[in-house]
Amino acid sequence: MPRHCCCFVFHFLLYMLLINIVKNNIITAFSHRHQALRERKNIFSNSPINYIYYLGANKHIYSKFSSVCEQKKLAHKKIAIKKWGIERNEKKKFTISLNNYNKIQQSKFMSKMVKENKASTKNENKCSINNTQDIRNFMNLKKEEKDEECDEKTKQDNNKENIKNETIVQKKKIDKNNKTKEKIKTKSETNKNTNITYPSIPKSIEKRWADYKKIIEYAKSTNVYLGAHISASGGVQNAPINSFNVSGLAFALFLKNQRKWESPPLTEENIKQFNENCKKYNFDKNLILPHGSYLINLANPDKEKREKSYLSFVDDIKRCEQLNIKLYNFHPGSTVGMCSTEQGIKNISDCINRAHKETSNVIIVLENSAGQKNSIGSKFEHLRDIISQIDDKERIGVCLDTCHTFAAGYDIKSYEKFEEVMNNFHNIVDSKYLKAVHLNDSKSDLGSGLDRHENIGKGKLTLDTFKYIMTSKYFKNIPIVLETPDITNDESVYKYEIEYLYKMCAKEQ
């Protein structure tokens, strides 16, 4: 046999031996793993504690398997990954099994404790049954003691009530004379609390004319001209009609939308109908008091904003000239906290002087304010200082609002105090500048600084306040305009208040 054939046979045998060795190692590894899994299942089913020892004792199985893979460089990476996943899942299962095992032990322990407690409670119940009669007797004694105490307290309370009743009877005998005085004092207060029913405006024109003629007779005898701030919806020409319906001899109105900067101008038809209605119902145009827009603030230190207010201000005055109205009332304004009151007063007076030059004959009327923060006009001195800086003194005046006056700190609740306030006004401002009155009751207290109007007889002011206005020399032949809330929503409240005030004035005379 040749030499090279022998070498080939030798190498072939060696190669076959190596293959058999590798196969045997792999088979043994898998067989060991299979056995390990079976043992793990058996051990895990018995108790989780034995499984701990199993994991520690059989780590060499996986190390052998991995070493074989590394030595032979086989492409079994997936097998290694599966091995790692098996270990992780086994650990999770082990933790779950431990938790379950602990819960089982706790439940067994608790069941033992419950059994022991039941046994103890049975013994206690036997003892308690014997003692229940003693406890009931003890509780009955306590109840009897409490009942006795309650009886004593009721007797004491009855004695106290009898003593109080005796003292009240004695006080009634003593205070008979004082009661009559208190009744006289509280007459005005009871009038405030009574629910007043306001009659509606008559539907027939004849009845309206009859009521209107009665008011004219009152006005002629007293020289007091009452009216209200009435609606001008649908056009200024409707204002005289609405004033006639409430029996007003004077009235106030807005010549345009009081909450907008721009409004359409008056048409020739508006002006014509307004003049015709004033003649029809015998209105004196000297007793008409238009009210300026709420947006106007001539005291504003900002030049642009003050100019915007001024243009609206002058537009109102020119509308008064178109309607041949002689008075125009407005709120002086506020410093807005951006300048001093002196500077605000100067801004107001400069705007009025400028408006006088651009218009002809309308008298600009300053309304006193309630004393809100930064407002100008709450003090008589403010009004005096504005008037002192006006060039044309014949075209400036003042409107006193009773609610604002009271809220600003001037006490006008009694006849005597109102007289003092008006004398003070005469000395500081001069009563010749008093051109109009806004007649309102006040919801707010004296000196509160709050502008809160109320219906006549329902606020903080007294009937003496309104009697003084109806009879005092300071308020003759000027427009006295109600600005009370229209609680009836049809202005019939103004008709009632006008008639009420005139009748009160007639009784005083």
From Swiss-Prot:
Knocked-out gene: effects: Normal asexual blood stage development. Normal transmission from the host blood to the mosquito vector with no defect in oocyst development. Salivary gland sporozoites are normal and are able to infect C57BL/6 mice. Sporozoites can infect host liver and develop into merozoites. No defect in the integrity of mitochondrial DNA.
Binding sites annotated in the UniProt record for Mn(2+): H404, D451, H453
Binding site for Zn(2+) 3: H404, D451, H453
GO molecular function annotation: DNA binding; DNA-(apurinic or apyrimidinic site) endonuclease activity; endonuclease activity; phosphoric diester hydrolase activity; zinc ion binding
UniProt superkingdom: Eukaryota
Span list, region Disordered: 144-188
Record-level GO cellular component terms: mitochondrion; nucleus
EC number: 3.1.21.-
Annotated Basic and acidic residues bias: 152-164, 175-188
Family: Belongs to the AP endonuclease 2 family.
Job of this protein: Plays a role in mitochondrial DNA base excision repair (BER) pathway induced by oxidative stress. Has apurinic/apyrimidinic (AP) endonuclease activity towards double-stranded DNA (dsDNA) with a preference for C as opposite base. Has 3'-phosphatase activity; removes 3'-phosphate from blunt-end, recessed, and gapped DNA templates and thus, removes 3'-blocks for DNA polymerase activity during BER. Lacks 3'-5' exonuclease activity and does not cleave damaged bases by nucleotide incision repair (NIR).
Name this polypeptide is given: Apurinic-apyrimidinic endonuclease 1
Gene name, Swiss-Prot/TrEMBL: APN1
